[in-house]
Amino acid sequence: MEVVEVLHMNGGNGDSSYANNSLVQQKVILMTKPITEQAMIDLYSSLFPETLCIADLGCSLGANTFLVVSQLVKIVEKERKKHGFKSPEFYFHFNDLPGNDFNTLFQSLGAFQEDLRKHIGESFGPCFFSGVPGSFYTRLFPSKSLHFVYSSYSLMWLSQVPNGIENNKGNIYMARTSPLSVIKAYYKQYEIDFSNFLKYRSEELMKGGKMVLTLLGRESEDPTSKECCYIWELLAMALNKLVEEGLIKEEKVDAFNIPQYTPSPAEVKYIVEKEGSFTINRLETSRVHWNASNNEKNGGYNVSRCMRAVAEPLLVSHFDKELMDLVFHKYEEIVSDCMSKENTEFINVIISLTKIN
């Protein structure tokens, strides 16, 4: 499985689409806003750029993508008015892997721009937008061309399934039953990928450029902690139920692993300091409930739809597409039972960085 070819959120605007099932991600963007705001204010008030080049890495599609743009434009507009400056030209780069539904994203752009003008008037910008398909673990932009890099809920995804994890039987991710070699392989891949991410962004950002990165993580130093692995453990249970029913072969589940690593703040800090291109301004964690909706009765249903929007393309690349309704129906039942007994939350790691040279 080539991750770059199959990793993307469900496209379009249907019932299982990411656009309609990304309330958790929206809440996280809103929770992170004070950190984003401070980073952008510091950037603008130190450089006062006439053109502001911003990249959203792992942008996906839907309202959340435009929420980020709206936040950043409003922050800059408020700050430049304080100083009596003319509005800069905004250049937004939307980056994601090639399988992302860029068509749906750009079809929504006109309505978004019209709505933004209604809220903040006609005096800002102009704004320019481009799509940049490709892996953010490679070079994406010309040298020193960016002022600001933003990424939310993307950097926990790995560039590939780690090597040497064939013995992770019965699991689809790191779990308490995973051999130590599997845990080490996951961390090794994460360290390689995040180091590359920092290296390439340091080449693309100008001196004093900022990054605000939010990713799924954990507070515990145990990489198999329930706070980061449980959501995938429950999906493995759903798949294994279909094995018991003879609908999926056991070896198919054994051969499937999620290309993701959810780091602790200490691991993030260690890699940033080791790579050496950035100073850390802030490094924090936050929590958000699995069910971001206010409707507690349908918690399992909401979580199942959210996870389907995220994970279905990966699953379809390995399992029969016709089984997806059944997989996520079983997943909904398992998640509902779990949520009735336990407090279920995602842990977010947020880091604000400044490029040194």
Swiss-Prot record:
Provide the tissue specificity: Predominantly expressed in petal limbs and tubes of corollas.
Keywords linked to the UniProt accession: Magnesium, Metal-binding, Methyltransferase, S-adenosyl-L-methionine, Transferase
Could you tell me the gene encoding this protein?
BSMT1
Source organism (scientific name): Petunia hybrida (Petunia)
Q: What does this protein do?
A: Converts benzoic acid into the volatile ester methyl benzoates. This scent, mostly produced in a rhythmical, diurnal manner, attracts the pollinators.
State if Magnesium is listed as a keyword. Answer: yes
UniProt-recorded name of the protein: S-adenosyl-L-methionine:benzoic acid/salicylic acid carboxyl methyltransferase 1
Where does this protein hold S-adenosyl-L-homocysteine?
Answer: 18, 59, 64, 96-97, 135-136
Which positions does the site annotation Involved in substrate discrimination cover?
150
**How does pH influence this protein's activity?**
Optimum pH is 7-8 with salicylic acid as substrate. Optimum pH is 7.5 with benzoic acid as substrate.
Q: What induces it?
A: Triggered by EOBI in flowers. Fades out in flower petals after pollination, thus resulting in a decrease in methylbenzoate emission. Strongly repressed by ethylene.
